[in-house]
Amino acid sequence: MNKIALTLSLLGFLSPSQPETLYNGRRSVVMEGKVAQLVVDIGGGSIVSFRLNDQPTNPLAFDSSEFDPSEKALLRPLGHFLCLDRWGPVTEAEKQNGMFFHGEASRVEWKTIKPPTSEGDYIQALMTANLPLAGLEVKREIQLSNNSASFLVSEQVTNKNLLGRVYNMVQHPTIGPPFLNEDTLVDSNAQKGFMQTSPLPTPENPVVYWPNALKGTRFIDLRRLLDDSDPNVVSFTFEEHIGWITASSPSQGLLIGYLWDTQEYPWLNIWRHAKNGKPEARGLEFGTTGLHQPFPVLVQKRQIFNRPIYTYLDTGQTSKRNYLAFLFKIPKDYRGVARVTYEIGQLTLHERGPGSKRKFKMNTGNLPLIIKQNTP
């Protein structure tokens, strides 16, 4: 055994007793459907790959070690990672105690409770992770459709502390090249928003509306990223029960999208990063907060646009949230998504553009997404 393999073995990354396989040299859970493949990394729980079986492009091609050369940890954010117990920075005191930017969920080893198992219309896997500093436990159920390029994730967070606490939970899907390029289009039904660069205590001024942001006095269209990522983080709210976001890459012939209940995840946070004059990464982040600040600031601010910017979990309490992810093949002249409609078992994309009647439909099979009936 070479030195690298020995080190990984000592850290548990090559444990032969685990029901996982190696993907890019890392322990992973690989789920193989009839239409698509899904890969989850054990060293941080990130969804590192979601691709069609007959197409090599992986939209979630992101590694934090490439974005930040100082990031050398084996347990690190990749692809679509989970921000838990926070989104963004820690206080100086929390940093001294070892808490991470974006929380611990992508910095701990996850355990497989149930390896990928065929359950008829879908492949199911169960995973869990304990966050020792946060005092939280997260359990994840993944159902990959056998009949379409879609999967449903249900995550339960339990407060293991002796006291209740505030926390946040943000999904951080991150797209990268070659899927991400100058022709990649991001669409959403998001509405009212603000730039994270706007100063406290009223960062919600000035107000912007999707897909626009402001750079000085000039409007920026967030649908497309070219060579300038300023402003690099802009956050939005929703007026509909279902929130959705899509990223279309016509040159790659592929679209990735997410759909969720806006009562569970009321915020959409758009992160953009360009490098050497080209798009390098885009975060399509949906979650329980839209303010990229430590908890003392969140607690003082409380709400923005009448939406909460943190949530509370009592001792022993469990909270569950779901989302649906999907892939579509698209033509080279695709103009993006105007609207997404969803009924249990049926997902439809309506194309943008005047006079456009093209629709792309997907039967998600036995993957129901529970949408609450109350307004957000």
Regions found by a protein language model. Give the residues of each.
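Surface-exposed acidic/polar loop and edge beta-strand patches at domain peripheries
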Residues: S17-L152, L163-P376
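Asparagine-centered strand-capping/turn motif at beta-strand->loop junctions
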Residues: Q156-N161
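Bacterial Sec-dependent signal peptides at the C-terminal "C-region" and cleavage site
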Residues: T7-T21
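Sec-dependent signal peptide recognition
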Residues: M1-T7
